[in-house]
Amino acid sequence: MSERLQGKVAIVTGSTQGIGLAIARRFAAEGAMVTLNSHRDDEAAQAIMAELGPQRSLFVLADVADRAAMETLAARTIERFGKVDILINNAGMNVFDEPLALSEEDWKRCFAVDLEGAWNGARAVLPSMLAQGAGSIVNIASVHGHKIIPGCFPYPVAKHALIGMTRALGIEYAARGIRVNSISPGLIVTDMIERHFAACPDPEAERARQAALLPCKRLGKPEEVAATALFLASDDAPFINATDILIDGGRSQMYHE
């Protein structure tokens, strides 16, 4: 690896599985000290800490929907590593339903995690980033923040809002050294997606069907999202701010599907 994050300190929320784990691993490989996070303290979290190295990683249990918990996460990171250079707001949840069938509880929880969770993270780290005059925040949005699929309400509403918040914060603090960007993944093969395939009557047929929908005829990998997060978080992207990058194999640009 090129050690593009040598000397940097990163917080990655929702980092014990899937895209978040791939980002945490890549950042650590590039020299960063990484604070891992999950809303549950399980064996996976401890195993990942051991993998990354206890001297260069920290695990903080926190629900991103809890503002006080996120402030504690930021404070513990600064106490341990002295600063925060990078925040990856990756933690999220899928809530897919028909609008009038959606429960009030699911509506509130979707926004609490997918939108307010990212704001809680940003609000917790921005004071220290502003004090040091530099910082990069990357929000993991979704292709659902660009295209609407029936039956997926209210997830796309939250992700559209997250992209809007990305742009607003990026503009608000650009002159003070802060960059805020987002990434919108399409279908990325994580453990959650593998479980979806496994639950289908013909898992391989469903996998092939999904791949056939993409111009490149293959599904995405978590490591590909991690590579983009690395670029946006690093000093290689100093003039990229308040924007969103789609990682969906080109599917969102197709007129017909």
What do the PLM-derived regions correspond to, one by one?
Residues 142:
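Residue(s) in the substrate-gating loop at a strand-loop-helix junction
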Residues 127, 171-175, 238:
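Alpha-helical segment proximal to the catalytic Tyr-Lys
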Residues 122, 158, 166:
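Active-site helix of classical SDR
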Residues 98-99, 103-111, 210:
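Substrate-binding pocket helix/loop in short-chain dehydrogenase/reductase
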Residues 147, 230, 241-257:
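Short C-terminal tail/terminal secondary-structure segment
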Residues 9, 16-17:
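Conserved glycine-rich cofactor-binding loop
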Residues 30-46:
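Conserved glycine-rich Rossmann-like NAD(P)H-binding loop of the short-chain dehydrogenase/reductase
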